[in-house]
């Protein structure tokens, strides 16, 4: 059950803000073995691991066009409409992030500029596990398509009958995924990192997963392929004062807790009354949840923290740097201006985390484990590279050249200096 903490001292903060431990190092030997086998044996190894881990015997990894077409008829019109609405909002928000480059003359005759280009080949990992995360398909494939990624590869584990959830296939087709493969876990990450007979090698891998997937992404990113960001268990913090609705707050905490047993939900509040009411409401709502066993286990990692004022609440919040932050206070826009460490922020009593998880338009692939102090969530920028260009004309070289020569000489790099000198000699 959630722990009630009242007026902790600053000396206690570090202990209070600890996340559930995610020890991937102990898994590295196992994960490395799987990666090496897939790298050496390709499809054969992936198929063997699918049989061992996902308990399914597959004849091929590739999802056929017939399977994709059939999926549309297997989900309700209501769900198709919801997915289409979410896709439209995600597309609208991420399209607004398009880079507009401009040429800058840093001095007369010296011009610099940038060009944004999509990463040519990207791999998206969509977990199977306890729920079909078709929303993550939209969060990753939509910005990849806007960025101009030429090849968008998706891997997701099949069920025991060898089928992919139809909502995942529908979302993938709607968002413009190029190829879909029946592969999960470490073997899927390895297949995208190194390529197999079926699965193309990609340049960057995106998507959440369990501790094995996290370890695999860490290992392949050491030298072979880029990844989106360091990942850990999902988390939410609600920052609230006496004006907050305890029913809403409890619902938000539980919506995070049902993600998985290692998720974390935190309330930081200035109201002792709210703290007590939220505890009571969490217990009431928990009893009605289908995934209550998972949520209850997660709540053991979770805390309801009472602090003396909003200044302290914000200081503690910025120290925690939550993946998701819900601000339910009287003057939430003013409070939000003082938030400097968070992945995504949800403002006011009518903005639950679920909105960003699914359909408001922001991305739900976010930094966890305190990485919001240094990392951003996935955005259009995650799928592009910015190439810099520069052009120097004669009048520019005459002015900038001597400065370059002087700097190169003082760094004892004579060839650097000479590359300028030979050009200046032609301009005399």
UniProtKB/Swiss-Prot annotation:
Keywords: Amino-acid biosynthesis, Histidine biosynthesis, Metal-binding, NAD, Oxidoreductase, Zinc. Its cofactor is Zn(2+). GO terms for molecular function: histidinol dehydrogenase activity; NAD binding; zinc ion binding. Binds 1 zinc ion per subunit. Pfam families: Histidinol_dh (PF00815). Coiled coil: none annotated. Zn(2+) binds at residues 256, 259, 357, 416. The active site is at 323 (proton acceptor), 324 (proton acceptor). GO terms for biological process: L-histidine biosynthetic process. The keyword Transmembrane does not apply. Its EC number is 1.1.1.23. It catalyses: L-histidinol + 2 NAD(+) + H2O = L-histidine + 2 NADH + 3 H(+). Pathway: Amino-acid biosynthesis; L-histidine biosynthesis; L-histidine from 5-phospho-alpha-D-ribose 1-diphosphate: step 9/9. Substrate binds at residues 234, 256, 259, 324, 357, 411, 416. The keyword DNA damage does not apply. Belongs to the histidinol dehydrogenase family. Catalyzes the sequential NAD-dependent oxidations of L-histidinol to L-histidinaldehyde and then to L-histidine. This is Histidinol dehydrogenase. It comes from Bacteroides thetaiotaomicron (strain ATCC 29148 / DSM 2079 / JCM 5827 / CCUG 10774 / NCTC 10582 / VPI-5482 / E50).
């Amino acid at each position: 059950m959630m722990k009630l903490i009242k007026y902790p001292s600053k000396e206690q903060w570090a202990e209070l803000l600890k996340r559930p431990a995610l020890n991937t190092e102990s898994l590295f030997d196992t994960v490395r073995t799987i990666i090496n086998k897939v790298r050496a044996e390709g499809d054969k190894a992936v198929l063997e691991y699918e049989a061992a881990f996902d308990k399914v015997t597959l004849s091929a990894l590739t999802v056929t066009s017939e399977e994709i077409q059939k999926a549309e008829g297997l989900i309700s019109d209501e769900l198709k409409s919801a997915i289409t609405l979410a896709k439209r909002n995600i597309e609208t928000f991420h399209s607004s992030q398009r880079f507009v480059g401009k040429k800058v003359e840093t001095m007369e005759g010296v011009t610099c500029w940038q060009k944004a280009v999509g990463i040519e080949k990207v791999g998206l990992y969509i977990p199977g596990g306890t729920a079909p995360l078709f929303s993550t398909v939209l969060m990753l494939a939509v910005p990849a398509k806007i960025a101009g990624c030429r090849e968008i590869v998706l891997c997701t584990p099949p069920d025991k009958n060898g089928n992919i959830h139809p909502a995942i296939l529908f979302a993938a087709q709607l968002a413009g995924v190029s190829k879909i493969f029946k592969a999960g876990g470490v073997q899927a990450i390895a297949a995208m990192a190194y390529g197999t007979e079926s699965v193309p090698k990609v340049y960057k891998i995106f998507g959440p997963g369990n501790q094995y997937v996290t370890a695999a992404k860490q290992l392949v990113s050491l030298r072979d392929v880029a990844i989106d960001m360091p990942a850990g268990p999902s988390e939410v913090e609600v920052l609230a004062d006496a004006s907050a609705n305890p029913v809403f707050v409890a619902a938000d905490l539980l919506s995070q807790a049902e993600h998985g047993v290692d998720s974390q939900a935190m309330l930081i509040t200035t109201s002792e009354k709210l703290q007590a009411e939220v505890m009571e409401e969490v217990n009431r709502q928990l009893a009605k949840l289908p995934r209550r066993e998972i949520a209850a286990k997660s709540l053991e990692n979770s805390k309801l923290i009472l602090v003396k004022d909003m200044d302290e609440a914000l200081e503690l919040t910025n120290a925690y740097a939550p993946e998701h932050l819900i601000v339910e206070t009287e003057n939430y826009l003013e409070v939000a201006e003082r938030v400097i460490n968070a992945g995504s922020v949800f403002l006011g009593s009518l903005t639950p985390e679920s909105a960003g998880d699914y359909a408001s338009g922001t991305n739900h692939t976010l930094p966890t484990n305190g990485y919001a102090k240094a990392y951003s969530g996935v955005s259009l920028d995650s799928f592009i590279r910015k190439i810099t260009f520069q052009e120097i004309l004669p009048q520019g070289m005459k002015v900038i050249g001597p400065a370059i020569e002087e700097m190169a000489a003082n760094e004892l790099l004579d060839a650097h200096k000479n590359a300028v000198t030979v050009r200046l000699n032609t301009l005399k």
